[in-house]
UniProtKB/Swiss-Prot annotation:
It comes from Arabidopsis thaliana (Mouse-ear cress). Transmembrane segments: none annotated. Residues 1-29 form the signal peptide. The gene is CRRSP37. Keywords: Repeat, Secreted, Signal. It comes from the Eukaryota. It is found in: Secreted. This is Putative cysteine-rich repeat secretory protein 37.
Amino acid sequence: MYSSYSLSKRLVSIPILAIQLLLIRSVSSLNLTNDYLNHKCLVSQGKYRPGDKYEDNLNFLTREVLSYNFPTGFIHISYGEAPSFVAIILQCRGDSYDSKCLSCYATALSGLRRRCQRNKGRVIWYDQCFLFINSIRSSPRKNDYRNVFSMHNPNNMIEDTELFNKKTRDFLYELMLEATTPNRTMMLYAAGEKKLGTKKLYAMVQCAQDILRCKGCLEWSINELSKCCHGKQGARVLGTECTLRYELYPFLRS
């Protein structure tokens, strides 16, 4: 599917065996791909030591997440005071709510434990969710493009590249407007398909449900496509505030 990705130039240890045993069953039932995409250890936020108050707060929150059923596929919870303040933000893809979101949480939690051991700030992206653990209080969140990266399908469009790019941008703008209409503000998500000659274009846009300017984030991401992914048959732009993707094959649950 994807053989390469590029990071934008602007661009835990959680010893809870019970959580992992509880969640592993739901992970195995996930039929669609949930590949690891990228991660970032936020070294500027420092690290915590085993047994300190930050670790206690982190373990409390990771257990607390299990009490949610994720009807909209999103959670932003926090606990404690600086320097032991912890926030967890989990945003699942719009078609991955309820138990499917919990499955992605288990995968992401395990992934962060391996890749960013004891970092207070860290984020990881998978096909179906991103998990952001943070030690800085910020709610609602402003758009921050430092933790953004892009990926693209290795295959290029052979003909009518400019027309394909234009129609793709236009379709993404349509979905952006749909996702940000007043009756969709709880999900901030839209997906669809559009016929392009003999082909079909599949696309989705989504914002995390705690950001101030969803439309501004998606507009910025759509503009990034011309820099990273010109003429590509598929691409994504992912961050901690919003994400978008398009392909010439279906990649979402119906």
